[in-house]
């Protein structure tokens, strides 16, 4: 095999591999999954903003100005800072306020997704319920069905 044949061989293999990849990537499930991941990432940003910019300030106002993201417990005596960022620089801290915020984010995402999926399931169920039943067969169709069934049983007219 000379070098020209080798190049052609690799071009054919590469072309086949590229075609297989394109076919795989263009399947509905893969494209749907990619769209879902992108929308999910954007939705995560919305929920993070909802928690950080709307819900937590309301909770903070109700609790007298508490900022949960800066709540921590020092695990080292050398930690004397008042903010989480500074405390982390000084030593080991248990950042339970940040954990509380992240947990709240998760619970809100889970609740919203549950509500969306529940609504979609209800819409799907309503669509199935509103489907019209199949039309009743005409008299001619009933007779033809009876004849077909009799022929299947072998009970046709005898000669």
From Swiss-Prot:
GO MF annotation: an example: mechanosensitive monoatomic ion channel activity
Chain segments annotated as transmembrane: 35-55, 97-117
Matches recorded under Pfam families: MscL (PF01741)
Summary of subunit composition and partner proteins: Homopentamer.
Main location: membrane
GO cellular component: plasma membrane
Keyword Phosphoprotein: no
InterPro entries cross-referenced by the UniProt entry: Mechanosensitive_channel_CS (IPR019823), MS_channel (IPR001185), MSC/AndL (IPR037673), MscL_channel (IPR036019)
Subcellular location: Cell inner membrane
Membrane topology: Multi-pass membrane protein
Family membership: Belongs to the MscL family.
Protein task: Channel that opens in response to stretch forces in the membrane lipid bilayer. May participate in the regulation of osmotic pressure changes within the cell.
Protein name: Large-conductance mechanosensitive channel
Record keywords, A-Z: Cell inner membrane, Cell membrane, Ion channel, Ion transport, Membrane, Transmembrane, Transmembrane helix, Transport
């Amino acid at each position: 095999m000379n070098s020209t044949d080798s190049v052609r061989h690799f071009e054919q293999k590469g072309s086949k591999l590229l075609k297989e990849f394109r076919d795989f990537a263009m399947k509905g499930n893969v494209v749907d999954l990619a769209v879902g991941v992108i929308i999910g990432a954007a939705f995560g940003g919305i929920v993070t903003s909802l928690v950080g910019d709307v819900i937590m300030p309301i909770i903070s106002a109700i609790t007298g100005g508490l900022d949960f993201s800066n709540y921590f417990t020092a695990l080292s005596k050398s930690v004397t800072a008042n903010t989480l960022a500074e405390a982390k620089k000084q030593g080991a801290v248990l950042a339970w306020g940040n954990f509380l915020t992240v947990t709240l984010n998760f619970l809100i995402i889970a609740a919203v997704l549950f509500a969306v999926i529940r609504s979609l399931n209800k819409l799907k169920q309503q669509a199935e319920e509103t489907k019209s039943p199949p039309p009743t067969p005409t008299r001619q169709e009933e007779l033809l069905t009876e004849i077909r069934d009799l022929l299947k049983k072998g009970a046709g007219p005898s000669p």
